[in-house]
Regions:
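Residue-level signature for tetratricopeptide repeat
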Residues: 362, 396, 429-430
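TPR alpha-solenoid repeat register
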Residues: 389, 422-423
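TPR/TPR-like (Sel1-like) alpha-helical repeat modules
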Residues: 398-420
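Selective detector of the "anchor" transmembrane alpha-helix that sits immediately C-terminal
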Residues: 431-455
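Hydrophobic alpha-helical transmembrane segments of multi-pass membrane transport/permease proteins
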Residues: 504-524
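N-terminal juxtamembrane cytosolic/stromal segments of multi-pass membrane proteins
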Residues: 456-510
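Alpha-helical transmembrane segments with an aromatic anchor "belt"
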Residues: 531-579
Length: 579
């Protein structure tokens, strides 16, 4: 009984601790039915703390129910214009989600895209009507733009507008279905002047395709699939008039930020496969939503900050989507994601961690490095391994001249460029303070060596060490090891010596193999940060040794078989020693 009581006394607290631990783990994901990921310094996806939490779901505008909504616009004053495509109308709500008005009934035929200016002028891309409709703030139709008549547009091309944005000058940029020339640029002057195409995607062709097409006949080439640029899937415009596009299948060019010449100014290493919508944030950041509900957030340089969200599995969990059509960012940094299948708008709220990161991101992008350090410090207090925060902190310290601190954070974030620059500056500072001493030491060493050489010449002070070294060098194993240098200088004579003069043995060859393995492992795992190719703290020495041995056996075996076929005189051990 005493033993049973002791066991119970020990087991009960342990079980309670396990229950508390499991409960805390469940609570972590109770508010978000998805995980949040970021990219570490090695370019691998790693889980991080939740960046955005589901806040609410908008299923109705006032008492109006949406049917297959395909786009929406959120203004700074809180007004939201939803393109209720199933009902062929636009539904407008205020900041409290109260219905303001509806318009477009009887005019819209197959609306796909909407853009609303700060003055509440509404532009609608209507695919079925083959037109762009413009409505004033009261919902009255004021203008209609149809297919441009300019020959440069293309006589055989149809005008099937899908998405639209408008800059501050009133120039419209329209994505049209099956138009691979780029976005259609239309000025409102003279009732709609076609200005040309903007932001055309490049064609993609690998070396094999180019070579294959070169040897085919004209008839065979005609049967091949045409190599034409992809049409953008969606776009957004920021307050400066810079246009962002997304195009599936473009890999590093999936997300583009286009300058005035239509050239991409951003490149991302992590990109979604099926992008559906893009939005510009309030802190020089960009959001891309996939059709399946995943949301990617990038900073101003194209570095991936977060991936979160996901596809609903039918359980109707808040925060998960079925088919995303559009994404918008509110002035309070909340994210609004339109789901056409569910006919609702999911709203996500940034966590405290994300708010600090956004503040730091904005200050850093504006060159206010000293101010950015405080929010960056808050971020690192919550997650000291967050790559972007360490990278930004390192760059901020570098700008201030704190190169030691910059070196530390650059190493944590695996920022090779900043690490190299910081190391260079530290070396320069060291040389400025120690160059004279280094020169004097080198002169002193040179003088000592000269003096020792003179003494040895007159007194023979190094005769005893020379005799000892000569005696050591005359030993068989040492001679065999030294033969390596002869072999490198004269490989043909070296092979002859191995085959007919037994200049080396299996023992000396094995010693050289072990030395080579040791140097390989040291070079791989214990080299400098800038040249290291493996994760710090990650060791797989047995696999490395096995790989070397397997490669050696294969090479020796292949050479032996070739020698045998060609009636060579070398034996297996000779080939092993020569390699």
């Amino acid at each position: 009984k005493k033993y049973i009581k002791k066991i119970i006394a020990f087991a009960v607290p342990l079980l309670l601790a396990c229950v508390i631990l499991v409960s805390s783990t469940l609570e972590t994901y109770a508010d978000a039915p998805y995980r949040t990921y970021t990219v570490d310094g090695y370019g691998s996806m790693t889980e991080t703390q939740t960046a955005y939490l589901p806040f609410k779901t908008i299923t109705k505008i006032g008492e109006e129910t949406l049917v297959n909504p395909t786009d929406f616009t959120l203004l700074e004053d809180g007004y939201m214009y939803v393109l209720d495509s199933g009902n062929k109308r636009v539904v407008v709500s205020d900041a409290d989600n109260e219905l303001v008005m509806t318009f477009g009934e009887g005019i819209l035929q197959g609306p796909r895209g909407i853009y609303v200016t700060p003055e509440h002028i509404t532009y609608i891309a209507d695919r079925d009507a083959k037109s762009v409709f413009v409505f004033d703030g009261d919902g009255e139709l004021v203008n209609t733009y149809t297919k441009p008549t300019a020959a440069m547009y293309g006589e055989t091309l149809d005008f099937l507008p899908l998405k639209i944005v408008v800059n501050s000058s009133g120039v419209m940029y329209v994505i049209c279905e099956s138009n691979t020339n780029g976005m259609v640029e239309i000025s409102p002057v003279d009732g709609g002047t076609f200005l040309g195409y903007f932001g055309t995607n490049a064609t993609k062709a690998n070396l094999w395709t180019i070579l294959w097409r070169a040897v085919l006949t004209d008839a065979q080439r005609a049967k091949m699939q045409s190599n034409i640029p992809a049409t953008p899937d969606n776009m957004a415009i920021d307050e400066k008039g810079v246009i962002y596009t997304i195009t599936r299948g473009e890999h590093n060019d999936t997300l583009k930020r286009l300058n005035i010449a239509g050239v991409n100014m951003i490149e991302t290493s992590e990109y979604p496969d099926v992008p559906a919508a893009v939005a510009v944030g309030n802190h020089d950041n960009t959001f891309v939503a996939t059709q399946t509900g995943f949301i990617y957030e990038y900073n101003n340089e194209g570095n991936l900050l977060f991936i979160f969200g996901g596809s609903d599995d039918g359980k109707q969990r808040i925060g998960l989507s079925t088919k995303v059509e559009a994404i918008q960012v509110g002035t309070d940094d909340k994210l609004y994601v339109l789901d056409s299948d569910k006919a609702q708008i999911q709203v996500y709220e940034p966590t405290e961690f994300t708010r600090y990161l956004h503040e730091a991101l904005y200050l850093f992008s504006k060159g206010r490095y000293e101010e950015s350090k405080e929010p960056l410090g808050k971020v690192l207090e919550m997650n000291n391994l967050f790559t972007y925060a360490n990278m930004a902190m390192g760059k901020a310290l570098y700008k201030e001249g704190d190169y030691e601190g910059a070196l530390k954070y650059a190493r944590l974030s695996k920022d090779m460029e900043n690490y190299s620059d910081s190391f260079w500056e530290i070396r320069n500072v060291w040389l400025k303070h120690n160059l004279t001493a280094v020169v004097l030491i080198l002169i002193g060493i040179f003088a000592v060596l000269k003096a020792l050489k003179l003494l040895d010449k007159k007194k023979g002070i190094f005769n005893a060490p020379r005799k000892a070294l000569k005696k050591l060098g005359d030993k068989k194993l040492i001679r065999e090891l030294k033969y390596m240098f002869t072999f490198m200088r004269h490989p043909i004579d070296g092979c002859y010596g191995i085959r007919f003069e037994n200049k080396v043995s299996i023992a000396s060859t094995n010693i050289l193999l072990v030395i080579m393995m040791v140097f390989y492992i040291i070079n791989k795992y214990f080299c400098g940060f800038l040249t290291k190719t493996v994760r710090e703290g990650s060791y797989d020495i047995l696999s490395d040794i096995g790989m070397i041995l397997v490669a050696l056996v294969l090479v020796v075996s292949c050479n032996y078989l070739m020698c045998t076929i060609n009636e060579g005189e070398g034996k297996f051990r000779h080939i092993y020693s020569s390699l």
